[in-house]
Every structure is written in C-alpha cells, then in structure tokens.
Amino acid sequence: MFIVIEGCEGSGKSSLTELLKNRLITEGKSVIATREPGGSPLGEQVRNWILNPSLPGISPYTELFLFLASRAQHITEKIIPALESGKIVICDRFHDSTIVYQGIAEGLGKEYVTNLCHHVVGEKKFLPDLTCLLDIPVDTGIKRKQQQKSLDKFEDKPLVYHNKIREGFLSLAEANPENYLILDGRQPLEASLNKVMTAYTELALCK
C-alpha cells in the first residue's frame, strides 16, 4: 500500500509520517518512510539545491522538471521495488504538492502539471492508495516553522502564496473525496494518527 502525507508548511507532515511508520511497525507491518523532494541520492541532491534560499533563483518550469526528474528516480529506484516486495510505503509529499506549488501557486497550470505528474513514469498513472491532508491555517503553520528553523525558499514566501497552497490542497481533496482523508493540523498528532490508522485498516480490508 502507498500512503502519502500532504499539507501546508508547518502542518506536521513529517512528524505524522514518522508516527504512522512506527505504529505500523509495532503492528508487525513492513514499512518504509520516504520524502519528496528526496527519497533517493539524486532526489536529495535536487532537494538541497532547490530549497537553498542562498542560491540564485531558477524559473518555475526548471523547478518543475527538476522535481519531476527526482520523482521519476524515486519511484523507480525506491517506491516500486518496496511495493512489489509487499512493504507499505509512506511518503511525505508527492504529486499533489507539485500540482499545488508549481501548477497553482506558481501559475504553470493545474491540468498541465497534473498530467505530467500522473504520467511521470509512463502512460499508466502512478497514484497513491490514500492521501492524508493535514490542513492548518497558514499563519499558524508558518509560526510553527519559524520556531523550528530558518525558513527555506518556499516557506519564506508571502502569506498570499501560502493561502493559494492551502486552497489548492483543499480543492484537490474536495474533488477526490474517495482518495483523500482531511485532518485538522491544529489537533494533537495522535488524534490524526488514529484517523489515518482507521482509514488504512478500511482500505486494507478492501484490497
């Protein structure tokens, strides 16, 4: 099973990813947790380069295709082999982050970016089984990030940009309710974890 954790900056994605991995392992499941951008040696290099606020700016199209190149490698090198071996894969960000950040907030076009993402490794769409969206008010999420570390180039964008991100995620979730679980990022992560586990159990019974 392939589970993706999505959300705005400071929503708790990385923490929920780790909690979910640990809970599934305690239940005897074979699990890997990964992230985007990243997840492979190539992907981590792309991540370090793109997110570095001190590097010269690159065009949104260049960013888009770097993210897609990283994802294609990540899917073929790590995600597909893990799924084929029977592991559960949990990924911190995936297609929808690219659709929302590059397609909507950067203005490259939602449909254009969606098509590129869904077919990044071939004609057949490569999609998660479940996407969990941690929704949180933009100002709350950014304040959390500011308390944790210095901001990267995307985190440091103006609030109007982050509001586009939040609205974009919610629009994707509302358009695909059968594949999305919306979680309140202001609530304790343990509460969100329990909801994800319920959704996971229901999905596993259907497979």
UniProtKB/Swiss-Prot annotation:
Keyword Kinase found: yes
Single GO biological process annotation from the record: dTTP biosynthetic process
Catalyzed reactions: dTMP + ATP = dTDP + ADP
Disulfide pairings: none
EC number(s) recorded for this UniProt protein: 2.7.4.9
Gene Ontology annotations for the cellular component aspect, listed alphabetically: cytosol
SUPFAM superfamilies listed in its UniProt record: P-loop containing nucleoside triphosphate hydrolases
UniProt keyword terms in alphabetical order: ATP-binding, Kinase, Nucleotide biosynthesis, Nucleotide-binding, Transferase
Name assigned to this protein: Thymidylate kinase
Function text: Phosphorylation of dTMP to form dTDP in both de novo and salvage pathways of dTTP synthesis.
Record-linked Gene3D superfamilies: P-loop containing nucleotide triphosphate hydrolases
Annotated TM spans: none
Top class in the EC scheme: transferase
Family assignment from sequence similarity: Belongs to the thymidylate kinase family.
Gene Ontology terms, MF aspect: ATP binding; dTMP kinase activity
Pfam families, per database record: Thymidylate_kin (PF02223)
